[in-house]
């Protein structure tokens, strides 16, 4: 049994055929999923998908490109989302120096 630890099942092209996406993944031996939120809105979408699928879990975070936009209320929202049992990880997070959209020091902070 494999787990896809980084998917975005809320993307419109995937979500509109979610049953088919999951079926094709199952055929390849992928039976669990962590749907990664890149901001609060997408994290909530990930969480809502978990309501109907016991094998889908969610994560919450901020994409490194948007690190410059993090506020105290954003951090509070992250903590609130982590209260849900199906929210199992923090991520999308990391350091992205390739595109350099957010200052590296802000990403580290």
What are these regions (language model features)?
Residues 1-109:
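Mid-domain alpha/beta scaffold segments of enzyme catalytic cores
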């Amino acid at each position: 049994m494999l787990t896809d630890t980084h998917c975005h099942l809320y993307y419109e092209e995937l979500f509109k055929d979610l049953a088919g996406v999951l079926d094709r993944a199952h055929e390849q031996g992928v039976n669990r999923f962590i749907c990664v939120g890149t901001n609060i809105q997408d994290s909530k979408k990930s969480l809502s998908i978990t309501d109907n699928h016991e094998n889908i879990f969610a994560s919450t975070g901020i994409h490194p490109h948007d690190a410059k936009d993090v506020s105290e209320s954003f951090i509070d929202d992250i903590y609130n989302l982590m209260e849900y049992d199906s929210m199992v990880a923090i991520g999308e997070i990391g350091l992205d120096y390739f595109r350099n959209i957010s200052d590296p020091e802000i990403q580290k902070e």
